[in-house]
Amino acid sequence: MGTRSRRPQLLWLLLLCGTCARVCGCNETRMLERLPRCGKTFAERMREVAVWKWCDLSQFIVFYESFTNCTEEETVVVGCYWPNPLAQGFITGVHRQFFSNCTVDRTHWEDPPDEVLIPLIAVPILLTVAMTGLVVWRSKRTDQLP
């Protein structure tokens, strides 16, 4: 009988706690205090991976997923939405710390030399003009036949 009388109280407590974050707003100070925990855990896990493998996502994807989930949970716990500019700045800092040397060398594309480029442009244009002329000439010729 005592537990039945507590159920409405528990329900009200859950409803109040669920809306507290929305009513109280985002506590950015607490968020910035809590996010480094995620970064510390991620850094400890990244020590298990050889530095030269830090650019190979398959080597640390599980750690990175945990890091992302941790930042999301810590942000939501203090009543903030995720992602937000402060959390994003923190995540960017972690990226700079671990992945700043992971730039991808992109192939620099250059135009071919003029000796190759001019025929590649001119031949289709001349073929188009020649075929159009041929079609016009043939259509005029059929009109003249009895």
UniProtKB/Swiss-Prot annotation:
Molecular functions (GO terms): coreceptor activity
Signal peptide location: 1-21
Subcellular location(s) of the protein: Cell membrane; Membrane
GO biological process, one term: positive regulation of protein localization to plasma membrane
Membrane topology, record value: Single-pass type I membrane protein
Major subcellular site: membrane
Record-annotated membrane-spanning stretches: 117-136
Disulfide bonds: 38-70, 55-102
Extracellular side: 22-116
Highest taxon listed in the record's lineage: Eukaryota
Cytoplasmic compartment spans: 137-146
Swiss-Prot/TrEMBL keywords: Cell membrane, Disulfide bond, Glycoprotein, Membrane, Receptor, Signal, Transmembrane, Transmembrane helix, Transport
Residues carrying sugar: 27, 69, 101
Pfam family, one: RAMP
InterPro entries: RAMP (IPR006985), RAMP_sf (IPR038126)
Record GO cellular component, one term: plasma membrane
Keyword tRNA processing set for record: no
Quaternary context: Heterodimer of CALCRL and RAMP3. Interacts with GPER1.
Function recorded in the entry: Plays a role in cardioprotection by reducing cardiac hypertrophy and perivascular fibrosis in a GPER1-dependent manner. Transports the calcitonin gene-related peptide type 1 receptor (CALCRL) and GPER1 to the plasma membrane. Acts as a receptor for adrenomedullin (AM) together with CALCRL.
The family this protein is said to belong to: Belongs to the RAMP family.
Name assigned to this protein: Receptor activity-modifying protein 3
Organism of derivation: Cavia porcellus
Gene name of the encoded protein: RAMP3
